[in-house]
Amino acid sequence: RAHLSNASTDAAKKSILNRIITRVLDDGTACSIGIDERNEANFLTGLSDGIIIVEGDDDKNTGIGLRVDYGYLSEHSFGVVTTGEVTGDDIERVISKANDDGNSISVIMLALSTYNKMRQSQWAKELAANYQGQTFNNDTKLPVPTSTLFDEAFSDQYNGISFLKIDRSVTYEKNGRRVSYKPWNANKLIFLPSADNVGSFVWGTLAEATNPVNGVEYTTVDEYKLISRYSKTDP
């Protein structure tokens, strides 16, 4: 309404109205964004959990799902000594295993909430204090290090390893209701040799691409998204 009222001529108002109608009825773009969101959610869930269910029978979908197992090895999966807390000893066990196997860790991916909780722990405070050359004892009340200080101290202690903090929310819609959630499992830390390439994004040709259904309009977006729109005209 604001756009229409600001138009100076009837032709301008008509042009703006046509653009608004086109935008509202542009199902292809809306679906494309939804596919991007689902891909992002699957990526983050799969990387943190090692398993995803594509369009499955979970709390966000109905019907039969496709279970994808990333094949994380049990000997490469570690727990923590104290439930709900990540310590330097927990991290060192993973790094030591990687080194023994001839692998190197450069990045640790984790939820921002988990990172902040870890930064407030006693071992993180002591790590930052040691990095700054500060002397302390068991009675010293050390401050919580800033993110910058903790990252620098951690990188210095663990041969350049850095943190990649995840705080991504994804919005999905079901039965006309939009809900946001965070697909990364906050209970998981993933140790990677590099954050530049953690896998490949591949796709194939769908059956409908070569055998379209009558009465269905198809649109291909970004080379791999086949979006269909069905319409019916009653007499």
Name the predicted role of every residue range.
Residues 1-69, 98-113, 235:
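Long, contiguous amphipathic alpha-helices that act as assembly "spine/axial" helices in icosahedral shell
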Residues 9, 26, 33-36, 40, ...:
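Generic surface-pattern signal
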Residues 10-13, 84, 143, 147:
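Intrinsic-disorder-associated interaction segments
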Residues 16-19, 90-93, 149:
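Exposed alpha-helical structural elements
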Residues 22, 48-49, 61-70, 75, ...:
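Intrinsically disordered, low-complexity regions
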Residues 47, 53, 60-62, 68, ...:
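Generic detector of intrinsically disordered, low-complexity, polar/charged segments
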Residues 60-139:
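Extended, solvent-exposed, turn-rich assembly/linker loops in the middle of proteins
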Residues 79, 125-235:
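Sequence/fold signature of self-assembling virion shell proteins
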